């Protein structure tokens, strides 16, 4: 049985050291990780292939298998993201909010690491490196607990990370992995508040619920939610169709993939057949409300489209597959009401009307809102953050893609000339 107390104590000690090391030393470790991933590519991909084969034999859904899969291209992207994190400005030590008080006290905030991060994740071997890289750059130690379904992949990548830390002269316990599949260890990690400062779960709704219900450590909830695109009559339909297709098919298992398409009634007769034909090329199943179904059922080429009547539950569902729900709405008010009821993750409007765009961005409550752009942009790499540890749907501490700055907090610093309080 793994001793989590020891792991936590080692992480806390490592975090104190990381908070003091130079940016150059942290960057050296990140480049060493990237180099190691490429040098050990065959070993990592072989381990991942074994994980994927087990998952396929067990009947794991294709969307989950896709999340598990590492390829040469994906591994190269992970390594490149690591280098991008090294190139980003180091937030630790930043001075901001300077002021001088009437008492003569000179006050400012200094950005500091959070401390020890616990990461619990399923079916996402890339998370091992993404979280480790960002935590290291932000001066945090991290305790990783990957799912048993990716155990070989996690072991292969954490070996690379450990070697890189040693090569860069950083504490080897700055990144630790819990390899025992016993779920009780997850519960213990969630309650290790003596050492762990924040928990970041990356997985399905059941994992997030388990973390929230069992944690005494603050939990960042995110990565789940229904994403919408609303299409107005003023949109350029020819250019809007590729945006919808990109949002749905580029990576359907991603949390920022399109789930529900809302189309203004005045746009529906022309736009719906256009987008249905484009989505059909990728075998996307269309779950349509009655008005959408009536328009598409008689459209040219409909016999090649996967049309299904939508169930009420489809409009609150994160599909994570080549399925999209489609609904015709009467106006922007109805679209906003629908998104308020079901959305909150990644929301977009396709429009040529600046007033509608401004209203949409002002009234939609979500982690990210886009005008004439795909929901797939809600991503740390796309935002220039290098990578992200999560896309938080929390309102407190961080919201949206969590990059370096979101992995820090601050300390108030007060300086005086032997000041006493009056």
UniProtKB/Swiss-Prot annotation:
Pathway: Amino-acid biosynthesis; L-proline biosynthesis; L-glutamate 5-semialdehyde from L-glutamate: step 2/2. One of its GO terms (biological process) is L-proline biosynthetic process. Keywords: Amino-acid biosynthesis, Cytoplasm, NADP, Oxidoreductase, Proline biosynthesis. It comes from the Bacteria. The keyword tRNA-binding does not apply. It catalyses: L-glutamate 5-semialdehyde + phosphate + NADP(+) = L-glutamyl 5-phosphate + NADPH + H(+). It is found in: Cytoplasm. InterPro entries: Ald_DH/histidinol_DH (IPR016161), Ald_DH_C (IPR016163), Ald_DH_N (IPR016162), Aldehyde_DH_dom (IPR015590), G-glutamylP_reductase_CS (IPR020593), Glu-5-SA_DH (IPR012134), GPR_dom (IPR000965). GO terms for molecular function: glutamate-5-semialdehyde dehydrogenase activity; NADP binding. This is Gamma-glutamyl phosphate reductase. It comes from Chloroflexus aggregans (strain MD-66 / DSM 9485). The lineage of its organism: Bacteria, Bacillati, Chloroflexota, Chloroflexia, Chloroflexales.
């Amino acid at each position: 049985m793994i001793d989590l107390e020891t792991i936590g104590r080692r992480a806390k000690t490592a975090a104190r050291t990381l908070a003091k090391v130079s940016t150059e030393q942290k960057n050296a470790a990140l480049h060493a990780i990237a180099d190691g991933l490429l040098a050990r590519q065959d070993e990592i991909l072989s381990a991942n292939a074994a994980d994927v084969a087990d998952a396929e034999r067990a009947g794991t859904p294709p969307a989950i298998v896709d999340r598990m899969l590492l390829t040469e291209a994906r591994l190269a992207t992970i390594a490149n993201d690591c280098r991008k994190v090294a190139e980003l400005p180091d937030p630790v030590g930043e001075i901001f909010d300077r002021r001088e008080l009437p008492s003569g006290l000179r006050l400012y905030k200094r950005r500091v690491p959070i401390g020890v991060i616990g990461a619990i994740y399923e079916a996402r071997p890339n998370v091992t490196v993404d979280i480790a890289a960002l935590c290291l750059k932000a001066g945090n130690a991290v305790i990783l607990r990957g799912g048993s379904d990716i155990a070989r992949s996690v072991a292969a990548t954490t070996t690379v990370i450990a070697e890189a830390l040693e090569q860069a002269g950083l504490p080897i316990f700055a990144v630790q992995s819990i390899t025992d599949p016993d779920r009780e260890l997850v519960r213990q990690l969630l309650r290790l508040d003596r050492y762990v400062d924040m928990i970041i779960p990356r997985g399905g709704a059941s994992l997030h619920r388990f973390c929230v219900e069992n944690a005494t450590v603050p939990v960042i909830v995110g990565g789940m939610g229904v994403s919408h695109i609303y299409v107005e009559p003023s949109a350029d339909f020819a250019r809007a169709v590729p945006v919808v297709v990109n949002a749905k098919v580029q990576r359907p298992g991603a949390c920022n993939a399109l789930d529900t398409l809302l189309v203004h009634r005045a746009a529906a007769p022309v736009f719906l057949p256009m987008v249905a034909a484009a989505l059909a090329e990728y075998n996307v199943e269309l779950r349509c409300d009655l008005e959408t179904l009536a328009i598409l059922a008689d459209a040219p080429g409909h016999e090649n489209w996967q049309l299904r009547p939508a169930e009420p539950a489809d409009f609150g569902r994160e599909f994570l597959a080549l399925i999209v729900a489609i609904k015709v709405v009467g106006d922007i008010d109805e679209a906003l009401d629908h998104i308020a009821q079901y959305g909150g993750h990644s929301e977009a409007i396709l429009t040529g009307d600046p007033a509608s765009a401004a209203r949409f961005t002002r009234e939609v409550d979500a982690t990210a809102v886009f005008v004439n752009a795909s929901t797939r942009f809600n991503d740390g790499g796309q935002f220039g953050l290098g990578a992200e540890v999560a896309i938080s749907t929390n309102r407190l501490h961080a919201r949206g893609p969590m990059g370096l700055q979101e992995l820090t907090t601050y300390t108030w610093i007060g300086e005086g000339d032997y000041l006493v309080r009056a």
